[in-house]
Structure formats: C-alpha cells, structure tokens
Amino acid sequence: MTNKNAYAQSGVDVEAGYEVVERIKKHVARTERAGVMGALGGFGGMFDLSKTGVKEPVLISGTDGVGTKLMLAIKYDKHDTIGQDCVAMCVNDIIAAGAEPLYFLDYVATXKNEPAKLEQVVAGVAEGCVQAGAALIGGETAEMPGMYGEDDYDLAGFAVGVAEKSQIIDGSKVVEGDVLLGLVSSGIHSNGYSLVRRVFADYTGEEVLPELEGKKLKEVLLEPTRIYVKAVLPLIKEELVNGIAHITGGGFIENVPRMFADDLAAEIDESKVPVLPIFKALEKYGQIKHEEMFEIFNMGVGLMLAVSPENVERVKELLDEAVYEIGRIVKKENESVIIK
C-alpha cells in the first residue's frame, strides 16, 4: 500500500467527493436569496440578517431527517425527491413557530460516494429550498465505508428562520372557540415508514392497488412531503393564525396539543378530515385499528391551524386552496385530542 493510494484502499474515494461538489453547484445556485454571503465551499455558511428587514428578529431553528422512507428510496432506486422530504420536515416545523426560512444545511452520510446518486439527492434538497424560499448555504457529504452498506445513505437537514418577535407563534394566543383548519397533505409525508414498510413488505411497488386511484404503489409511497411555507407566511404576516401544528410522527394525538396550553383540547370532527386513499389502504392491508391511524399518520392533514372565528374567511381567501374546517378548541376535560 503506497501513501498515495492509502485512503482509496481504505474505501474513501476523494476524487468522487470532489465530483459531487462540482455536480451540486448548479443546484445550490437555484436557492440563492438576499442575505447570502460568501461562496459554497467555505468553512462556514454566512447570512446577513439585516437583509431580512425584520425589526426585532428572533432566529428559530429546526433539524430533522426522513426516517426509513430512505429505505424505500434506496429500494426503488429513486433519489430525486427524498431531499425535498428532508427540507419539508425542517421548514414545516419552524413555520409552525412563525418563522420564515432563511437558510438550510444538509448532511449526507454514505458508504460509497456515487456522484450521480448524490447529485439527485442534493437536487431534491435544492428543490425543497426553492419551495421554502431558503438558501442552501452549506452541507457535508461523508463517505463512511464500514458504517453503512455500500448502497445505503442517510440524510439530515438543518433549517434556520426568522420571525418578528411580536409574531412568534407559541400557542399562547390559542383560546377556547378557535376554529381548527386543516391543510391537505401530499400523502404519508415522512413519518410512520417503519410501519408502512412492514405493511407492504411483500409488494414490489409496481402494484396499482384499487384504493390508489390508478397510481403505482411506489409512486404514492415516495410522494414528497408538502412544504407549507409559501401558503402560510402571508397568514403569519397578517397575524391571522393563533396556533400551528405540523402533523408528523405521533399523528394528531401527539402533535395537535403542541400548539395550545395544557388546559385546552382539540375537538375534531372525523367526518370533516380529508382522508387520503393511501391511509385507507394502509388501514386495510395492515389491519391497523382505525383509532391508531390518528396516532401515527397525518390522515390527509399535514398542517393544522387554530384561527379566531372572525378570521376564518380571510384565511381561506389568502390560502386559495381547499381548506377544511375540521374542529374547534374546547376546554380540556380528559383528553387533549377528541376525535368524534
């Protein structure tokens, strides 16, 4: 073993790493926004907060991954949307606190650098950033032979946003009588996939199940997570929203109570929830108890808003999409979420 080839012989391809950087530059360039300083490849990404025009800025950050949905991306060899999932999981969390996303960083760890595949992953991250209005200002690609299988990789992201101090959404404004509005999800989004994979373990992904309205199973399972930023930001700017819940792991039961005080509860009319076909299929083929579905999945509502009754029509007008009045805030007696 010569010194020149020592790293390569240990399984790390430095040249492939350089190629990845060159391939992703054009995708990163798509995400440019006011405030970005410096060029890709520095030791740290820089952002000029004064360019946001926010008078009393509060930075709000979030980090997340996409769980075992990655395993389906690997199984079906489709890597161009999983990055959007990663961005969505982060920015939807910080928008729930009232933040406008400013910038994003990603982390990809793999056992073997495959430049074409990793370019697809980062292209998806960039697309998510464009949808969220966030700049992709840095990241890390780690080649770790022995830590992962040769075809495996993991993906995580980190989002930072800004809110006017007076417009932070922390649940303190939610009161009894507020209306709960549901914004539709694009599908399963990025949680519950350990169960999803078990339910469909014996399927190839090419199947067109009768519940899925003509779509292949793999298309539905890898449908990228919806990014709600551009829909919700105008509502925050007009201070029309009292609370926001991003419905992720733990479904309605765990996430909805995060947007209001402990003495309140959410009363939800199940008949008003726009349940998507994939959830009906999961319940049927997985033989999952109906009530448990609401403890795991978004059931068709990826983001829930608590809105004062007098603001409901204005919110609907600004959203300009199907909005579902699915419940209201009540005084808590026993449970924090009542599904009727």
Curated annotation (Swiss-Prot):
Pfam families (alphabetical): AIRS (PF00586), AIRS_C (PF02769)
Group of enzyme by EC: ligase
Biological process terms in GO annotation: 'de novo' IMP biosynthetic process; adenine biosynthetic process
Coiled coil location: none
InterPro entries, A to Z: PurM-like_C_dom, PurM-like_C_sf, PurM-like_N, PurM-like_N_sf, PurM_cligase
EC number per UniProt: 6.3.3.1
Reaction(s) catalysed by this chain's protein: 2-formamido-N(1)-(5-O-phospho-beta-D-ribosyl)acetamidine + ATP = 5-amino-1-(5-phospho-beta-D-ribosyl)imidazole + ADP + phosphate + H(+)
Compartment annotation: Cytoplasm
Main location, first listed in the record: cytoplasm
SUPFAM superfamilies tied to this protein: PurM C-terminal domain-like (SSF56042), PurM N-terminal domain-like (SSF55326)
Superkingdom of origin: Bacteria
Keywords for this protein: ATP-binding, Cytoplasm, Ligase, Nucleotide-binding, Purine biosynthesis
Family: Belongs to the AIR synthase family.
Name the UniProt record assigns to this protein: Phosphoribosylformylglycinamidine cyclo-ligase
Organism, scientific name: Streptococcus pneumoniae serotype 19F (strain G54)
